[in-house]
């Protein structure tokens, strides 16, 4: 990736910013997906053909027509084919700009979010805004699958390397789902830690658990956005394991009232949003 690209140098991340409390869609800042995908060899014929960046927005508030504050939670799904991803701090600042703005209804807020986010992403964005009462019964769940974290192995290096995946696929062809809660990377711009869980569902030669875990742990000091990490994992698994089918799904912890949950697959549709223990 070209870290000096003007689209990155202009981002508000890591900079002192003024918080606006009146609606301002110009606060949203795009990051071209192409910046990272070119280096990974991802083209318009992506190795994944289904996916989205699913955001949960916990800090959403506006005024009704009488001036009474309203609060809600929004689910946002940005299609993987959009030209841009949306930078998270700008998303937070944009949501803050709703705080002192009057909207006629929850539906108007929903429509406004969808319009602005679609324009910033240059692609399809779906939005669903929920009253708090709709979230009170939402359970805390875990990823389905076999957790590979409880291995008795020695880790001496935390430098990213996909070479950990060399000969990771071995033996018979299986369909299985593997899970790790040890995914940690750093923000591309600020180097702040990003904590996540990752689920890998595949059909292919059985994956060696130790090698896969070492690979995932090697992200620990790696600087990339959430969405880019998931696409890198997908590409590396395709390259080293040649699976018949593959899904990579990560759910990251919340920052600034937002959590980001990228999903990429070549055979499964984007699942319904959920909530995990650290979210």
Curated annotation (Swiss-Prot):
Task: Write the Enzyme Commission number(s) for this entry.
Answer: 1.7.1.13
Protein's name in the database: NADPH-dependent 7-cyano-7-deazaguanine reductase
Task: Write out the catalytic residues in the record.
Answer: 187 (thioimide intermediate), 194 (proton donor)
What family does the Swiss-Prot or TrEMBL record give for this protein? Belongs to the GTP cyclohydrolase I family. QueF type 2 subfamily.
Where in the cell? Answer: Cytoplasm
**Tell me, which GO biological process terms does this entry list?**
queuosine biosynthetic process; tRNA modification
Concerning SUPFAM superfamilies, the annotation shows: Tetrahydrobiopterin biosynthesis enzymes-like (SSF55620)
> Is RNA-binding among the key words of this record?
no
Q: Which reaction does it catalyse?
A: 7-aminomethyl-7-carbaguanine + 2 NADP(+) = 7-cyano-7-deazaguanine + 2 NADPH + 3 H(+)
PANTHER family reported for this sequence: NADPH-DEPENDENT 7-CYANO-7-DEAZAGUANINE REDUCTASE
Annotated Gene Ontology cellular component terms: cytoplasm
What keywords are annotated for this sequence in UniProt? Cytoplasm, NADP, Oxidoreductase, Queuosine biosynthesis
Per its UniProt record, what NCBIfam families does this chain match?
Answer: QueF (TIGR03138)
Residues that, per the record, bind substrate: 86-88, 226-227
Its biological purpose is as follows: Catalyzes the NADPH-dependent reduction of 7-cyano-7-deazaguanine (preQ0) to 7-aminomethyl-7-deazaguanine (preQ1).
Q: Pfam families of this UniProt entry?
A: QueF, QueF_N
Q: Name one GO molecular function term.
A: preQ1 synthase activity
Entry annotated with the keyword Cytoplasm:
yes
């Amino acid at each position: 990736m070209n870290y000096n690209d003007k689209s990155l140098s202009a981002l508000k991340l890591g900079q002192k910013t003024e918080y606006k409390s009146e609606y301002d869609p110009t606060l949203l800042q795009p990051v071209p997906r192409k910046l990272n995908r070119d280096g990974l060899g991802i083209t318009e014929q992506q190795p994944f053909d289904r996916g989205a960046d699913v955001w949960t927005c916990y800090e959403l508030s506006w005024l009704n027509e009488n001036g009474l504050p309203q609060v809600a939670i929004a689910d946002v799904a940005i299609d993987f084919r959009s030209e841009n991803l949306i930078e998270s701090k700008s998303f937070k600042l944009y949501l803050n700009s709703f705080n002192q703005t009057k909207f006629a209804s929850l539906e108007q807020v929903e429509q406004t979010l969808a319009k602005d986010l679609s324009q910033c992403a240059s692609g399809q964005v779906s939005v669903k805004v929920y009253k708090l009462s709709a979230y009170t019964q939402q359970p805390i769940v875990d990823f389905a699958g076999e957790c590979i974290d409880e291995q008795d192995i020695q880790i001496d290096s935390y430098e990213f390397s996909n070479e950990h995946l060399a000969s990771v696929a071995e033996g018979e062809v299986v369909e299985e789902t593997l899970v790790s809660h040890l995914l940690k990377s750093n923000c591309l711009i600020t180097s702040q830690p990003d904590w996540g869980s990752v689920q890998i569902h595949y059909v292919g030669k059985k994956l060696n658990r130790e090698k896969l875990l070492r690979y995932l742990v090697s992200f620990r000091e790696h600087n990339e956005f959430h969405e880019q990490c998931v696409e890198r994992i997908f590409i590396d698994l395709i390259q080293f394991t040649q699976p018949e089918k593959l899904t990579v799904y990560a759910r990251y912890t919340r920052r600034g009232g937002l959590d980001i949950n990228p999903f990429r697959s070549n055979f499964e549709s984007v699942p319904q949003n959920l909530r995990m223990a650290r979210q």
